[in-house]
Amino acid sequence: LTGHLCCMMIWWQATQVISPPLPVIREENNSHKMGVSLFPLKRVVTTSSTQLEMIFNCLCSRVVRTLCSRTQETLVRIQLGQNKASFHLLKSPSRRFIFNCYRAIFMFI
């Protein structure tokens, strides 16, 4: 229950504080992997609480893993950075896939 409430609070903050920016694709040097920045985490979660970060990371992992299995994309890893949550794929993800991940995280209920 606590985890659900925290996720709801994060989602509510996201809808109140910012209008979601467009996802940004950046190519890593010397690698075929693509890093996809989903949203500016600092502007959504204003606390540095480890518990909140763990809940948020689990939420992102589950959403992206589910979408990867549905679209047969190959997931390499998900990284929760200081400024952003990102996931890395073996091949360049489609814009539709990025949009679906982005939308699913913000519209999680």
Curated annotation (Swiss-Prot):
Keywords tagged on the record: Cleavage on pair of basic residues, Disulfide bond, Ion channel impairing toxin, Secreted, Signal, Toxin
PTM statement from Swiss-Prot or TrEMBL: Contains 2 disulfide bonds.
GO molecular function (one): ion channel regulator activity
GO annotation, cellular component aspect: extracellular region
Annotated localization: Secreted
Coiled coil regions, renumbered to chain: none
Propeptide residue span(s): 17-43
Signal peptide from the UniProt entry: 1-16
Tissue expression profile of the protein: Expressed by the venom gland.
Function per UniProt: Probable ion channel inhibitor.
Name assigned to this protein: U16-hexatoxin-Hi1a
Species this protein is from: Hadronyche infensa (Fraser island funnel-web spider)
Organism phylogeny: Eukaryota, Metazoa, Ecdysozoa, Arthropoda, Chelicerata
